[in-house]
Amino acid sequence: MKFVLDYKITTILLIGLILRIISIYFYRDIEIVNEWGIIVKNLEENNILSVHSVQGVPVPNIFMPPLYPLFLYSIKIFFSNTDIFLWIIYFTQLLFALISIYLAYKIFLEFFSENISFIGSLFFATFPLNVYAVSQISSIVLQMFLFNLFILSFLKLFRNMDHKFLFLFSISSGLLMLIRGEYFIFVLFSLIYLYFKNKQITKVLTISVLVLLIISPYLIRNFNIFNVITITKSSGYNLLKGNHPNTKVEGTPMFLSVGKIVPEVNEKLQKLNENGPNVKYDLMQDKILLDQAIEFIKENPTKYILLYFKKFFSFMFLDINSSYPNYYSPFHIIPKLFLSITTLIGLILSFRFKLNIINYVALFYIANIGLFSFFFILPRYSLSLLLIQVILSLFL
């Protein structure tokens, strides 16, 4: 993969750089809060990857995927001063964001002419939520970088199973699974798609082994602690957050306050806490939340089926009842609606009943929305599919 910069992509990168510097200056987080802050603090003070504490004692984490907390902690090791620590994070995320723009441009060139790729890259680079993301302590910027690397590698492998891209695809796949556990499903889908296109089982198995090698240290860690083979176990929390009597499309914020938001689980959670610190606490808590979410859905299936389609609609277009600050700002809602409409039209125009690359993109898009809609839809989730949406939109 040759990194050659012409004046077009240089212009886009310069615009992207300026916009993101402005975003960081005005909108940056001034501290690490919520789960990120807790995990980094526990790594620093207690040498344990932990997001929950029982009676003041941190318990091992299986709730959060590990890559972004470890990314934060790796910086914290060298920069203990809070201000410097945060600025290094923003600078690093800015670098990831600029590389993501370049990768997006290379991806668009796999489908379109230079002029159309320039337009797509400019839209990708200036999409307001994408610009804003770099100023936040969130895994989304790192995720987008890895995802763009994943897609570019997949495109190259789809056309020619080159060893160089085989390794890039394997690395990006493994790291994506460590930043968002559900990528296991999409990596598996991609491998199956590759096999049916190229019929090269040896190379597909090689990728599988390499991915397994990347994630195996964390799988072994979780097996030793929890006796389960998984990267994360938070399906109960996520399902309940998006499927309880008082929830909405974007879910109900309930980190460290589940019992207050869903009183039906309060008694069981209290008993779990009264038993004292337990290395399997995260696993046991998630089982309680999963059982309760399933019970809610069984009690009123019609309500939650309708809610599922509301979530699907809100992901594809907009959430008509969002409580997120500035969600309805013209700078957010107009580009989002424009992209949503063009994506849908592009999806309809480009889809064919063939085993081709554009169908992979279309199926990847639909499958992601379908999966997320079982849980809840946050505004930033749309960023994870921004590249896919722009590809589909450019087929107009």
Predicted regions span which residues?
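Transmembrane-helix motifs of polytopic, lipid-linked glycan transferases
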Residues: T10, F91-F112, L149, S153, ...
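Short helix- or helix-capping micro-motifs
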Residues: G16-L19, S117-P128, L152, S173-M177
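Extracytosolic helix-loop segments that constitute the early lumenal/periplasmic catalytic or substrate-binding loops
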Residues: I21, I32-P60, L67-L70, I77, ...
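Loop-to-helix entry region of an early transmembrane alpha helix in multi-pass inner-membrane enzymes
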Residues: P66, L70, F78-I99, S121, ...
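Transmembrane-helix signature of polytopic, membrane-embedded enzymes
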Residues: I101-T126, M144-F145, K164, N356-N359
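Membrane-interface transmembrane helices that cradle and orient dolichyl/undecaprenyl
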Residues: F111-E114, F150-L168, L176, L194-N198
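Short acidic/glycine- and proline-prone juxtamembrane loop motifs at membrane-interface regions
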Residues: L129-L142
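Membrane-proximal stem/loop segments at transmembrane-domain junctions that anchor or position
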Residues: F226-K310
